[in-house]
Every structure is written in structure tokens, then in C-alpha cells.
Amino acid sequence: MANKIKDGRKLRSQNTSDHILSTIIKLAQEGNKDINFDLIAKETKLGARTIFRHFKDKDALLKALHIRIQESTIDGFPKIYEKDSLTKRMNLLISYLCDMYSINKELFYWTAINIVQSEQVYKNAMNMHKLHRKNIIKILPEIKNKDEREQEAILHILSFGFWRNMSFFSKKKNKEIKDILLFNLKKHLKTR
């Protein structure tokens, strides 16, 4: 409750910033590759000057966008308990990752397209990559017991790129991908 904004102007300002960021995420998830200030202004029904009042430049906007996406993605990782079996943890993780990749695939594509055009997008992507790896290892600490080559193989199996290849090129459905991932993880982590 202490963090609640009580000032009406500050609350409206925060709501407007949230609306702008939510709109950008929606545009990316819909497959828009060229998201610019004019498109954001049109979709939010706000003037471009209003957007610039909230975010001084494109980098500031991208930083705020990264924080928003990071919070929702990282907060979504399954909560695990030490007593949970390895198989249960693998299933929870695989289910979360496949569903998250499916929902956000266009956002991942947008990032890949824009990573070479923007230093800030590159920094954001590298930070998210590190956070994903950290959270995966937190859920499956058994990965740390493997040599570096096998760790990389396991992390690759759990990556968006692997999911995309299975989904797009191999035309697998999420259920099939989850089964393939579980089979591969069990093989690498030696479970039955």
C-alpha cells in the first residue's frame, strides 16, 4: 500500500505510460515489425508529444519496455520447491517455456529484427537471455553438474530458437514439442 500513487496527476501519468508500453507489446505480438512513434501514437490515440513527455527518446522507451517484459516473463517462471521431483520441475518448466514462447513469438521475432538496429534492444535481449538461463538453472540446478558443452546443449533445447524450429520448420504442435523437450531433458539429466 505504501507504494500506491495517491496524486491524481502522477497516477494518470503512470497509467498513460503503462498504456503506451502495453500497446507496444500488443503491436509486437500482432507481428508489427516497424513499431515507430507515429504508429504508437495512432494505436494509443495519444499525440506523439505526449509519448515523448513520458519517454524522452527511443532508448528510454525501449528500457521501460524491457523492464515491463522482464517483470512479466521472469515473474511467470514456475515456483519450485526443493521437494519437487526432477520430472515435476522439468514438466513445469517446459510447459511454461512452450506457452510463453507461443504467446510471445512475434515479440521474439521483433527483437531479432531490431537487435542489429538498436544498441538498447541488443542490451535488453542479452539481459533477458542471462535472466532466462539463470531461472532455468534455478529450477533445474542439476544442469550445473554437467560439463560446459552439455550445459549449453540443455539450455539450447530449452531456448526459443529450438522451440521455433520445432514449431515452424517441423510443424509440431506445442504438446508434441513439450514431449520432445521432456524426452531430451530426461536423456541429458538421466531420469526415467
Describe the residue ranges of each PLM region.
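Basic, helix-initiating cap at the start of DNA-binding domains
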Residues: M1-D34, D38-E43, A60
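Amphipathic alpha-helical linker/stalk segments
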Residues: K26-Q29, K33-I35, K63-L92
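Short hydrophobic/aromatic patch on the recognition helix
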Residues: L46-F55
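Short amphipathic alpha-helical segment with a characteristic S/N-K-E followed by hydrophobic residues
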Residues: D57-K63
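Amphipathic alpha-helical segments used for helix-helix packing
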Residues: H66, P78-K79, C98-K123, R164
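Amphipathic alpha-helical packing segments from all-alpha helical-bundle domains
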Residues: E106, E119-E152, D179-K190
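Amphipathic C-terminal alpha-helical segment
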Residues: Q151-N174, K187-R192
